[in-house]
């Protein structure tokens, strides 16, 4: 499933304009753990010497966030939700070259307001 193809509403806000929350399903979490491989670390090290954006890490971070978000959406759908509000991201370093990326929010059922 691609986030772009999702039929679930996602927002960082605590409500969705034009919608009424009719049921709160609970907290949903999506987690992924990524390792910065040796090749990426070497390329990033060279790039950091000259300055500027480290594209290898940017791409890895974007992919990890999308994967965590997609997993959160799947959990929300499994609960019967059609929206997730108050979505946030967090990350932690688990080991020297491993990072945990978490997407979390509140799964809810919404209906269009009249």
From Swiss-Prot:
Pfam families: YbjQ_1. InterPro entries: UPF0145_dom_sf, UPF0145_YbjQ-like. Belongs to the UPF0145 family. This is UPF0145 protein STK_10800.
